[in-house]
Amino acid sequence: MDLPGDSSTPGRQRLCRQPHAGALWGAKSPKRPKLQPLGAPSPLEKASRRVLAVVLEDVMAARMVPLEPQEESSTPRHHSNHRDSVRSQPPASPPRQAMWSPQARPPDPLHLCREPLSRIRRPPSTPRRQSRTTPGPDEGPSQKVDQVHQPTLVVMLQDIASSRPRAEGFADEAPNFIIPARRAEPKVMVHQPKPPSRDLPAPSRPSALSANPLASPPPAPDPVLEPPSTPPPSSLLRPRLSPWGLAPLFHSVRSKLESFADIFLTPNKAPRPPPPSPPMKLELKIAISEAGQPGASEGTVTVSPRPPIRQWRAQDQNPSATLTKPSLGRSHSCPDLGPPGPDPCSWPPVPAPSSRPRPRRHTVGGGEMAKAPPPPRPCLRKEVFPLGGVGASPPLVTSCSSTASTSSFSEPAEPRLSSTKRKEPRAPEDQVLPDSETKTIGKVSRFRIRRTPARSQINLTPMGLPRPVRLNKKEFSLEEIYTNKNYQSPTTRRTFETIFEEPRERNGTLIFTSSRKLRRTVEFRDSSLPRSRRPSRGARATAGRTLPPSLAPSPDVEPLLQQRLQELDASLLEEEEEGDQDQPHRT
């Protein structure tokens, strides 16, 4: 389908952007191979090329301004036994001002052709393509062509390389370079015949196309902005020395080509693991400082860790370094920090508190708050020594080592040396006590560990309550029985026939005995003896089988049994004899 205003001959070949391998690809080979050979594009690649063609068509359609094409005259040239045609279009009429709107686009996208706006050097009418596995740069265009013809997406861009002002109709003109898209598929090569030596461009190629020399031939000048005289064919192939005018558009189209090719032509990539984040280092430094005297704020304070006890004792014996320092009345397990001084390596003595009030920072109150004594210094560890007090002896103050200025923490022996002096009065007490007592005082070793569990007490109930104490007596008088606190008079339902039973009156008559069967004798067992346990059900069953010895037959009963058996036998014999005598009478 021709563009609007096309007056060219119907048999003229056109530059078409169509992704299907149809009209222009099989000129040399009339029949397409049925089987897909090695190196042929896969269906995924074909689909991606179609998508690229549609996207580029939408991008460039709004900026395309068609010209009325002129008649062409072709001059044949022979190079490497192949024919290349150079078209020349003399502009016979001024360009039209009508824009090609998107509504006037041809309905058939498969045969969409865009006429070039200039006399450009076309690729050969039957471009040769060869699929190979390892493309080499030294491959000549005269090499024989493979039978497989693959469609290549061709984007036509043209640079308006002229310093003259543009015509009004070319305000939105799109560039027209012939750029084969070979971004993501290195196996598909486009071979074009080289121009003769006399037509080679003298100046260097532009910087925009130098990165892709095989895919972008040199552009052609614009014939519309030139004088109407027909230039020689050699000048048509030579680019002009002028900057590129539409380089940003070219880069945008190229970036879209690359992005679509990366999406549709690259295989699935394994997800890369995120780069390992650098480990976080948390450093917590706690410095205990106090507001010093006015005028000494420019000094620095260094906090020293707790020195070992051996260092305290070693320096405790050196009285030359002792200086008076008032105690602050706080826990003696934390170091005593002096005020900052000009020398960071020494701990100057603290002067005695003067009578004048000490100025306090960040206070808005009156003189009462200013006269109040300063609070004790903060303590990081809560340890209290029993012998430490407020009025104890002053601690020792020494100078730090010479390496304190280079290190972050110095180690003076001053902290908590007052506690060592407070421990001195306790030393003679420890010497008076023997070694055996000092080892056992306040230790767990003095408690004996029982190897066997303690026996449970008998006079306790299962709940742990004490049992009532009973007298070990076998005979009780009636007074003791009835005066016992545990005695209760029998109720009407629970009455016993005793000598003290009171008669009850029923229906006007006195009843001395009850109608219930009551036991006349009561056996009082000794309470000191343990009660006999009731036999279990299994024991009762076994006891029923074997007679107890009290119920066992005595030897006197045996002759009685024998006599009884003999009597039974005699009676049986008599009955038999009587039966024998009655039988003959019946016969």
UniProtKB/Swiss-Prot annotation:
Function field: Functions in tethering peripheral heterochromatin to the nuclear lamina during interphase, possibly through the interaction with heterochromatin protein CBX5/HP1 alpha. Might play a role in reattaching heterochromatin to the nuclear lamina at mitotic exit. Promotes myoblast differentiation during skeletal myogenesis, possibly by stimulating transcription factor MyoD activity via binding to CBX5/HP1 alpha. Involved in the positive regulation of the PI3K-Akt-mTOR signaling pathway and in promoting cell proliferation, possibly via binding to GRB2.
Disulfide bonds: none
Pfam families given in the database record: Tantalus (PF15386)
Predominant place of localization: nucleus
Keyword Thylakoid carried by entry: no
Stretches with biased composition (Acidic residues): 572-581
Any one annotated GO CC term: nucleoplasm
Protein name as catalogued: Proline-rich protein 14
Superkingdom per UniProt: Eukaryota
Ranges where the record places region Required for nuclear lamina association: 136-365
Gene behind this protein: PRR14
Required for nuclear localization as annotated region, ranges: 519-536
Subcellular location field: Chromosome; Nucleus; Nucleus lamina; Nucleus, Nucleoplasm
Positions with biased composition (Polar residues): 1-11, 314-325
Residues modified as N-acetylmethionine: 1
Alphabetically ordered keywords of this record: Acetylation, Chromosome, Myogenesis, Nucleus, Phosphoprotein
GO biological process, one term: muscle organ development
Ranges where the record places region Disordered: 1-48, 65-152, 181-241, 290-444, 524-587
Region (Sufficient for heterochromatin association in interphase and chromatin association in anaphase) residue spans: 1-135
